[in-house]
């Protein structure tokens, strides 16, 4: 058995065990940004108090059965509803402490509202990992990641927030800086990586993830000059070799997507249960709903359809079940 297949089987085993569970929550589907390539429609408001209480009741039932619980915050921009994030996170953390369950918490945020006091508060309730995106250097980033209310750029505020964390906070955390690649922005990304290397390379809490901008259904997808998979691989290797002082992370070729895993699902701001954070408007992604008493009502046929990659360990489906199954005509 090759090392690669052992890694894949290990990831598959983690995906199938009932002792691990990952929950992705959308405290709101509103956002303070209007990124050029975003696929979301911002129609749903924040979670109601009833939905929040139902999530807490669900966690009361689920966490005692686990050895590891992972809570991920998504959106929209989750920090627009910091109160909800804090309320549910505190509840989950206390339950995990009570039942001796390992607790990991992650947030995907644009970073604009992640000031030093917010960072410290979130760290105290167990949120210690963040993904923050830049679209190249200041000039390029500010063309793509605009504020919703003024259409001005966001680079300086996000950068200043990260500097505050680096310079004035020694709390343990992992901050993954996601750098977006297109077919024409290599020089801009080089400029950004040079700036990151000069500023953050000696702080081992900061990591770099190089990721292409994908065509995910945004209304301005046609304005993005997307990079091919082959060219992306070449550019990534060149950048890694050029900026050796930075710590780069990659998902690996034996990656199993969260949406392919039976022990992971998401709850949207209205209590709808889904599998994929991208295919939000797809009917196949509407797999169930959260009931008021904290129980889950699932459409078993839809829910099980996401796990077809495990039938024969099809790596294409395990890597991205939504698009792979669409291409195969199974969605």
Predicted regions and their residues:
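Short, charged low-complexity linear segments at domain edges
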Residues: 2-20, 239-245, 251, 290-304
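Conserved alpha-helical substructure of the radical SAM core
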Residues: 3-120, 125-128
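Short cysteine clusters
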Residues: 31, 35-38, 257, 271, ...
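Buried hydrophobic side chains on well-structured beta-strands
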Residues: 71-73, 107, 132, 177, ...
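Radical SAM enzyme [4Fe-4S]-AdoMet core and its adjacent flexible, acidic
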Residues: 135, 139-262, 269-270
């Amino acid at each position: 058995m090759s090392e690669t297949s052992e890694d894949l089987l290990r990831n598959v085993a983690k995906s199938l065990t009932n002792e691990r569970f990952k929950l992705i929550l959308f405290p709101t589907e509103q956002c303070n940004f209007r990124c050029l390539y975003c696929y979301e429609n911002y129609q749903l408001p924040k979670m109601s108090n009833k939905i929040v209480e139902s999530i807490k009741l669900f966690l009361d039932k689920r966490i005692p059965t686990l050895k590891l619980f992972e809570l991920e915050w998504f959106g929209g921009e989750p920090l627009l509803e910091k109160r909800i994030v804090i309320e549910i996170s505190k509840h989950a953390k206390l339950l995990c402490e009570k039942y001796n369950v390992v607790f990991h918490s992650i947030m995907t945020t644009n970073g604009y509202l992640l000031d030093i006091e917010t960072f410290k508060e979130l760290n105290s309730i167990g949120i210690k990992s963040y993904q923050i995106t830049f679209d190249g250097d200041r000039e390029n980033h500010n063309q793509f990641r605009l504020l919703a209310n003024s259409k001005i750029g966001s680079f300086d505020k996000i950068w200043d927030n990260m500097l505050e964390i680096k310079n004035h906070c020694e709390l343990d955390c992992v901050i993954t800086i996601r750098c977006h690649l297109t077919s024409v922005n290599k020089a801009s990304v080089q400029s950004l990586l040079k700036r990151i290397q000069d500023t953050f390379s000696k702080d081992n809490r900061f990591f770099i993830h190089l990721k292409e901008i994908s065509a995910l259904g945004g209304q301005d997808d046609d304005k993005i000059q997307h990079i091919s998979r082959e060219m992306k691989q070449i550019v990534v290797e060149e950048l890694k070799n050029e900026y050796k002082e930075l710590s780069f992370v990659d998902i690996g070729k034996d990656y199993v997507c969260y949406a392919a895993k039976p022990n992971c699902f998401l709850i949207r701001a209205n209590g709808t249960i889904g599998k994929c954070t991208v295919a939000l408007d797809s009917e196949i992604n509407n797999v169930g709903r959260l009931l008021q008493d904290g129980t889950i009502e699932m459409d078993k046929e839809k829910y099980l359809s996401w796990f077809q990659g495990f039938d024969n360990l099809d790596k294409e489906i395990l890597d991205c079940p939504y698009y792979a199954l669409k291409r195969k005509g199974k969605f």
